[in-house]
From Swiss-Prot:
The lineage of its organism: Eukaryota, Metazoa, Chordata, Craniata, Vertebrata. It comes from Rattus norvegicus. Residues 301-314 are annotated as: RII-binding. Coiled coil: none annotated. Residues 299-353 are annotated as: PKA-RII-alpha subunit binding domain. Expressed highly in the heart, and moderately in brain, lung, liver, kidney and testis. Hardly detectable in spleen and skeletal muscle. In kidney, isoform Delta is expressed in the principal cells of the IMCD. GO terms for cellular component: apical plasma membrane; cytosol; exocytic vesicle; hippocampal mossy fiber to CA3 synapse; lateral plasma membrane; nucleus; protein-containing complex; sarcoplasmic reticulum. This is A-kinase anchor protein 7 isoforms delta and gamma.
């Protein structure tokens, strides 16, 4: 699925990626649905989101009226579940950012190679800063649900670390694939890392669903790194571009792009304004492994900046107080002298008298 990538350990930590704004066009001209323009590949919004069924306990036979009421309650609940699944349209996702420069540089070479063969595909390319793996998609409808999602992400952290057993999870990327010729992606190579990532994805889905969040897809989770999708450029359909031709990327079929180490998972918005570097808006992030024991550089810079500002403010306040005191002191001296003058004047008058 497509993505946005890593977020802030507060909201600004996702700045390590850049991406251009995805254009929105007349989606009726595209073979892919409107959801295809979001950072995941053709999500099936009719999936089973894991909503619990109403218990089907035995109803006492001696109370047919109550039995009828129970059946009515169950029917209402089923209708609500069906409506919830029908209205399910993910707008947030968990992202694993791709920050290895070897991987991102290799993807740029791939994209440029494709564009040299067909420059009509320019707008179908994913921006430099948006390369990622989408771990989970979800629907968060308001600020309260976003806060619940943030809590769920924090709860996910120890589960992920337990799955990894203190080891790094290395994700090697090798070769090219497509989803029905509409979405082009770099493949995640086979290996034990795949089962670990699948377990993390399933754990994330369960963690968010247990908090009442609509999350996940009906299709099997297939981790991938999207580099282009035709739905980003609906006009291509009118120009006769129906699919991504294999010949465009054939020389990269067996290319090894590099390895990414999982160190961060971000909760990102698909719809909020992207960051200045092109990366998706991040609500929160968790860091995994050694980098969690060492404070991130960005966070350290923020901390240092705050200290510098606090010191500057404190110094300014102290300077102001000193200047204020200095201004008062001459005035106080003049008052004393004036009082002494008054007393002396009174004495002179008395002498005259």
């Amino acid at each position: 699925m497509e993505r946005p990538a890593a977020g802030e350990i507060d909201a600004n930590k996702c700045d390590h990626l850049s991406r251009g704004e995805e254009g929105t066009g007349d989606l009726e001209t595209s073979p892919v649905g409107s959801l295809a323009d979001l950072p995941f590949a053709a999500v099936d919004i009719q999936d089973d989101c894991g909503l619990p069924d109403v218990p089907q306990g035995n109803v006492p036979q001696g109370n047919p009226k109550r039995s009828k009421e129970n059946r009515g309650d169950r029917n209402d609940h089923v209708k609500k579940r069906k409506k919830a699944k029908k209205d399910y349209q993910p707008n947030y996702f968990l992202s694993i950012p791709i920050t290895n420069k070897k991987i991102t540089a290799g993807i740029k070479v791939l994209q440029n190679s494709i564009l040299r063969q067909d420059n009509r595909l320019t707008k179908a390319m994913v921006g430099d800063g948006s390369f990622h793996i989408t771990l989970l998609v979800m629907q968060l409808l308001n600020e309260d649900e976003v806060n619940i999602g943030t809590d769920a992400l924090l709860e996910l952290k120890p589960f992920v670390e337990e799955i990894l057993e203190g080891k790094h999870l290395t994700l090697p990327f090798h070769g090219i694939g497509t989803f029905q010729g509409q979405v082009g992606f770099v493949k995640l190579a086979d290996g034990d890392h795949v089962s670990a990532l699948l377990e993390i994805a399933e754990t994330a889905k369960r963690t968010f669903q247990e908090k009442g969040i609509l999350a996940g897809e009906s299709r099997t989770f297939k981790p991938h790194l999207t580099f282009m999708k035709l739905s980003k450029a609906p006009m291509l359909w009118k120009k006769g571009v129906r699919k991504i031709e294999p010949g465009l990327y054939e020389q990269f079929i067996d290319h090894r792009f590099g390895e990414e180490i999982l160190y961060q998972i971000d909760l990102c918005s698909m719809l909020k304004k992207k960051q200045s570097n092109g990366y998706y808006h991040c609500e929160s992030s968790i860091v995994i492994g050694e980098k969690d024991r060492k404070e991130p550089e960005d966070a350290e810079l923020v901390r240092l900046s705050k200290r510098l500002v606090e010191n500057a403010v404190l110094k300014a306040v102290q300077q102001y107080l000193e200047e204020t005191q200095n201004k008062k002191q001459p005035g106080e001296g003049n008052s004393v002298k004036a009082e002494e003058g008054d007393r002396n004047g009174d004495g002179s008058d008395n002498n005259r008298k």
